């Protein structure tokens, strides 16, 4: 039966346009682009004009961002190491992750958040290390202040996280056509959640001065925590991500399931359910789990039952060198021997009749 004019079939092309990004954030490809700043700025595909302007104007910041890509991708892979999709990257793809992030899924939400957080972390750290011309330590942390332990003096080098957040917002969000399509709004929201996550773990560190370290005087500064804390926090947000739909005027979100609360600025949001990532699917960007190592004794996501999607697994015996027969020698060393250890490794079987990828 034909739908009436103004019905769902009329809205479907517009909905698909809203949900389909042109490409993923191609600035991620800066990790693989070396050479001078001009070479880097002109050869990263897909940068919008504002991003290229910032790239040419702040080549030292771009180098910091490029180095930071390796750090946040490693963190992404750590968090997803026991899952079917393991945040694998494609070296020859300028989107870095391939087609998997074209879907507005939980995984896309996490990657946008962790990448935005990675820019904040990398830029802020470079500021504190004196590597950037446009910033240094936080200039606002001067003079005397108070906390629950009393009065202290600001000293040392407080991480200038406000600069890191400001630059990350200007550079990363520049690609998103804010207010024009659903995916751009989703990306902007998750980018902001990532930036806020880094600041959440900014901590005050102090050094005591006085007789025998009596803390008669204290000098304090603000420092970012290890990036793993941000990764762990965003992982929890990934597991609690909220599915949303566009509101009627196309300017914001509403929850897809009315039983759930409205997302806060700290929550990750997504539109589409994830594929199961069990088999290789070029359209979905999934490499499948054939050849992936699984844990025979686990009951979690890395178990052979879950990881292999019920297809079964192959077992092979391998040997590895380990330290053994360790003894303590006075004083003060532990000396060990090198021993060969045999262990069983379990890997997921391939689908019986499917084109499957090499181990991921």
Swiss-Prot record:
GO molecular function: cytokine activity; frizzled binding
A Pfam entry, by short name: wnt
Biological process according to GO: atrial cardiac muscle tissue morphogenesis; canonical Wnt signaling pathway; cardiac epithelial to mesenchymal transition; cardiac muscle cell proliferation; cell fate commitment; cell proliferation in midbrain; cell-cell signaling; cellular response to transforming growth factor beta stimulus
Keywords linked to the UniProt accession: Developmental protein, Disulfide bond, Extracellular matrix, Glycoprotein, Lipoprotein, Secreted, Signal, Wnt signaling pathway
Glycosylation sites: 295
Cellular-component GO terms for this entry: cytoplasm; extracellular space
Signal peptide, first to last residue: 1-25
Recorded family membership: Belongs to the Wnt family.
Function comment: Ligand for members of the frizzled family of seven transmembrane receptors. Probable developmental protein. May be a signaling molecule which affects the development of discrete regions of tissues. Is likely to signal over only few cell diameters.
Protein name: Protein Wnt-2
Biological source species: Rhinolophus ferrumequinum
Originating gene: WNT2
């Amino acid at each position: 039966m034909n739908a009436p004019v103004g019905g769902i079939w009329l809205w479907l092309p517009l909905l698909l346009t809203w949900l389909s990004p042109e490409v993923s954030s191609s600035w991620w490809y800066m990790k693989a682009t070396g050479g001078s700043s001009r070479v880097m700025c002109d050869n990263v595909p897909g940068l919008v004009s504002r991003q290229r302007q910032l790239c040419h104007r702040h080549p030292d910041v771009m180098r910091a961002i490029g180095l930071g890509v390796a750090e946040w991708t490693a963190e992404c892979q750590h968090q997803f190491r026991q899952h079917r999709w393991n945040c694998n990257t494609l070296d020859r793809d300028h989107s870095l992750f391939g087609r998997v992030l074209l879907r507005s899924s939980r995984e896309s939400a996490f990657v946008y958040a962790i990448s935005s957080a990675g820019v904040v972390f990398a830029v802020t750290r470079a500021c504190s290390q004196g590597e950037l011309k446009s910033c240094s330590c936080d200039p606002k942390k001067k003079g005397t202040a108070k906390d629950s332990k009393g009065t202290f003096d600001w000293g040392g080098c407080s991480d200038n996280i406000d600069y890191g957040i400001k630059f990350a917002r200007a550079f990363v969000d520049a690609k998103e056509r804010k207010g024009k399509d659903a995916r751009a709004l989703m990306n902007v929201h998750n980018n902001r959640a990532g930036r806020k996550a880094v600041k959440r773990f900014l901590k005050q560190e102090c050094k005591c001065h006085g007789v025998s370290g009596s803390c008669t005087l204290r000098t304090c500064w603000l420092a970012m925590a290890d990036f793993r804390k941000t990764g762990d926090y965003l992982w929890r947000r990934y597991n609690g991500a909220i599915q949303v739909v566009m509101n009627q005027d196309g300017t914001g979100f509403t929850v897809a399931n009315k039983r759930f609360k409205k997302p806060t600025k700290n929550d990750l949001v997504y539109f589409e359910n994830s594929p199961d990532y069990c088999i290789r699917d070029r359209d979905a960007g999934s490499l499948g789990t054939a050849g992936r190592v699984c844990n025979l004794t686990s009951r979690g996501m890395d178990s052979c039952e879950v990881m292999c999607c019920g297809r079964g697994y192959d077992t092979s015996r391998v040997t590895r060198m380990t330290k053994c027969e360790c003894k303590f020698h006075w004083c003060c060393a532990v000396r060990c021997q090198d021993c060969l250890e045999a262990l069983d490794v379990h890997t997921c079987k391939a689908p019986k009749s499917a084109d499957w990828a090499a181990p991921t």
